[in-house]
Amino acid sequence: MERKNVKLSEVSPMMREYLKTKSEYEGILLFYRLGDFYEMFFEDALIASHELELTLTGKQAGLSERIPMCGIPHHALNVYLEKLIEKGFKVAICEQMEDPKTTKGIVKREVIQIVSAGTLTSPEIVNEKDFNYIASITDHKYIYSLSYADLLSGKVFTTYVSYDEEKLISLIVNLNIKEIIVKESFNIKLLHKLKSNYNVYISYYDNDIEYKQSNVFKNINEENLIKNTSLVLNYLTNSLKQNLSHIQEVELIDSSIFLELDKECIKNLELVETLRNKERQNSLLGFMDKTKTAMGSRLLKSYIISPSIDKEEIESRHNLVQKLIDEFLLKSELKSL
């Protein structure tokens, strides 16, 4: 039985609420909380049972025939989320907003979050030592605007990229950007290349009205960069229901003060992973990374793939290292924090 053939008046009250919710999230798998399980129905059940190797069953919902259904235990959510995201799906998490034991009638449920490739934050799923950016790109026909956000740290960056597709692709690959937000008019051939060759998830969105928390643009004056950054922030807030209260001021990246390394150079020099096994362990990053925190590890990686060529910045880093070498008590205190 297909969902499009079902009339709301014919189904049970619970299924009626499910169908109303599902109609707002077409093209997204809906995990619908029922007791200790997240249930999927109709086409979502068919897809999930196949992709996750779940048993497909049926449910009586007031109709003459049973509707397709499958489910997962709520405590195993992250395991199944990771598998679906890796396969390129978006998942809407619909939770019970009331205690079923104390509620009379239908329990109120709401979609509290939509999870996609660029919005995974659970330590059980993401590698906290690596970037996990979601980005937006605008094509100005002479230059690209690129903005990218890390939901774990709340950091947001924006920059211009020269009008060269290979340079743009290299930067996206080097930054390990998982998901890209673009407008419908964006170059479809370039998007296909990113999706098929580099497993980048593509989402379409058009709202680039300046983000409501305009104070995040305190250091940004360029209208093109503000609009492009607003595109990804509005998408996260409005479409994916993400809480961005921890988002920091947007940082402008001046690409002219960094040595430009393309993806092939980083790959062949084994700067962040080995050629043969794609492992971090025996790469340059793996040998150098003695950091104590995941944030420190991500910072070190950014230094390796984008070496500074600014003399003042290089000397400042050297001075900081020398200070820690000279003041071992300070170093010990910092380590213990």
Annotated model-derived regions:
Residues 1-298, 303-305, 311-329:
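Basic, polar low-complexity surface loops/patches
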